Amino acid sequence: MKAEKLIFLKFGGSLITDKNQTETARIDVLQFLLSDLKQYMDENPQIRVLIGHGSGSFGHHAAAKYQTQLGVSSEEDWLGFQEVWTSARRLNSIFIEQATKARLPVMSFPPSASLISSGHKVKTWDIQPIQQTLEANLIPVVYGDVVFDEQIGGTIFSTEELFFHLAQFLHPSKILLAGLEEAVYQDFPDNQLPLRHISKDEATDSFIKPSQFQDVTGGMRSKVEQMQKLCRENPGTQIEIFSARKEGDLLQALNGQHSGTIIS
C-alpha cells in the first residue's frame, strides 16, 4: 500500500462521549461524523482509512479509580483491569454498530487481544490482519484499551500510542485527531491563543496546560508529544488536531481544509 493512500483518523473520547457522564455515548455526534467519513470515502475510493477512538467516559473513570495505567498486580488491580476492558469494549461495540449503520465496512481489532507490552513499550503485536483488512478495502478500528505487560502486569495504551506503533509499518501520509477543542491552545482554558503549527522538535511544557477532563493517558500534552515523536520517526507524515463538534468539520479536515493545529 502506498503511503499517500492511507489516513489514520482518531475520534477523541471527549468528542464521542460525554466525559462528565459515566458511559454516555454521543450517538448524534457519532452519526454525523460517520456520515462525513462515508461521504469522503465514496468521493475518494482510492483512499484507505484506519480508525482509532478514545474511551472517554467509558474507560477513563474505571482506569483512574484503579490506576491501571501504572501497572496491575493485586487481585483488586486485576478486577479493575477487567472493568476497564469491559468499558472500552462496550464503547467500541457502540462505535462499530453506528459505523455499520452508516454503511462503513469496519472491523474491530482490540489491542488487548493481540498486543503484549513490556515496560509500557510494544513487545509483540501481529498487525498483519490489520494490513490485510486495509488491502481488502475494509476499515480497521483500534481503540484505547488495556494490554498485558510482561514487566508491570498490565497497563493501558492510548490511541495515539497505538498509532505511533502502527505508523512505523503502515506509513500514513496524514493523521487526523478529531476532538472538541478547535486547536491546541497555549492559554488553556481561556482558549484565545490557538497554536496553528507545532514543530516536531518543539518543547511542549511551556505552552500546553493540563486538560479539563479526566484523562488517564495524559491529556493534550501527552497527545502532542506522542505525535511529535511520530513525526520525527516518520518524516513526511502530517498531523492535525482539530474540532469536529459540528457536522461538516470532519469532511473539511479530510479534504485538507486546515482549521486546527498542524504538527510536522
Residue map of PLM features:
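N-terminal glycine-/serine-/threonine-rich phosphate-binding loop
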Residues: 1-50
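Short beta-strand segments
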Residues: 8-12, 50-53, 109-110, 141-143, ...
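Glycine-rich beta-strand-to-loop/alpha-helix junction loops that act as flexible
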Residues: 11-14, 52-56, 242-245
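Charged helix-capping and loop-helix junction motifs
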Residues: 25-28, 123-128, 155-163, 221
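Ligand-binding beta-strand-loop-alpha-helix segment within the catalytic cores
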Residues: 65-146
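Polyanion-binding loop/helix "lid" in catalytic or ligand-binding cores
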Residues: 79, 83-96, 153, 161, ...
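Catalytic-site beta-strand/loop segments enriched in glycine and acidic/polar residues
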Residues: 129-161, 202-211
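Acidic, metal-binding active-site segment of PIN/NYN-like and related structure-specific nucleases
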Residues: 169-194, 241, 246-247
